């Protein structure tokens, strides 16, 4: 199935230029999507309510939308977990899955080597390479039945939790092993003096 058939819509962020304001709505870009997470920096560029409303007059970002970077570092993904009032620049694609695919499955499938290769093959040869929406829509993705998608997502979510737990716990584990090494090293290299 092509991506367009699995989504209610496939859009990208704004192509317009907007005046920066001190207090307003964050205008985010591809640099704000890393390791499956959308980050909203406190010092992010802000736009006015009028500009924000103009960008999203036809739709709003909502929980469950899948974001994909399509300019610069192409192919990084994140799921919008909570309703947020942010706008995106053209470097971010916004995918709203339809009833044939879950957000989590789409998030994971777009990270696979096969889908990443497809994305890379669609990059335009411009100054800052990117994937146009017409090409993004044509990405072929395997879509199993919903029950199978949920089973796959459940397994991948568990692996993700384990990986993140390991990453978070790794420095402490390394420190424990270093202390253990020092203890046994000292034990092995401490000799009783003759006559003592």
Give the label of every model feature segment:
Residues 14-15, 41, 55, 125, ...:
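Short, solvent-exposed loop/turn positions at domain surfaces
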Residues 29, 50-111:
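A short beta-sheet element
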Residues 3, 25, 61, 67, ...:
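Short, structured motif recognition centered on aromatic/hydrophobic residues
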Residues 1-39, 53:
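Low-complexity, Lys/Gly-biased intrinsically disordered segments
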Residues 1-13, 169, 173-179, 184:
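Non-catalytic DNA-recognition/assembly elements of restriction-modification systems
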Residues 38, 114-116:
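Conserved loop->alpha-helix
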Residues 86-93, 124-145:
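A short glycine-rich beta-alpha junction/loop motif
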């Amino acid at each position: 199935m092509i991506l367009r058939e699995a989504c209610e819509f496939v859009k990208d962020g704004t192509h317009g230029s907007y005046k920066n304001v001190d207090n307003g709505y964050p205008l985010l870009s591809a640099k704000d999507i890393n390791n499956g997470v959308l980050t909203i920096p406190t010092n992010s560029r802000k736009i006015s309510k009028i500009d924000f409303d103009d960008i999203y007059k036809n739709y709003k970002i909502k929980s469950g939308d899948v974001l994909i970077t399509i300019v610069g570092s192409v192919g990084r993904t994140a799921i919008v977990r909570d309703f947020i009032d942010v706008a995106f620049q053209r470097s971010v694609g916004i995918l709203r899955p339809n009833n044939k695919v879950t957000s989590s499955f789409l998030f994971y499938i777009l990270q696979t080597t096969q889908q990443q290769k497809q994305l890379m093959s669609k990059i335009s040869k411009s100054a800052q390479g990117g994937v146009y929406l017409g090409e993004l829509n044509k990405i072929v993705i395997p879509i199993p039945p919903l029950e199978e998608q949920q089973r796959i997502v459940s397994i991948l979510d568990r692996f993700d939790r384990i990986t993140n737990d390991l990453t978070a716990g790794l420095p402490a584990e390394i420190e424990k092993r270093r202390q253990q090494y020092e203890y046994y090293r000292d034990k092995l290299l401490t000799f009783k003096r003759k006559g003592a």
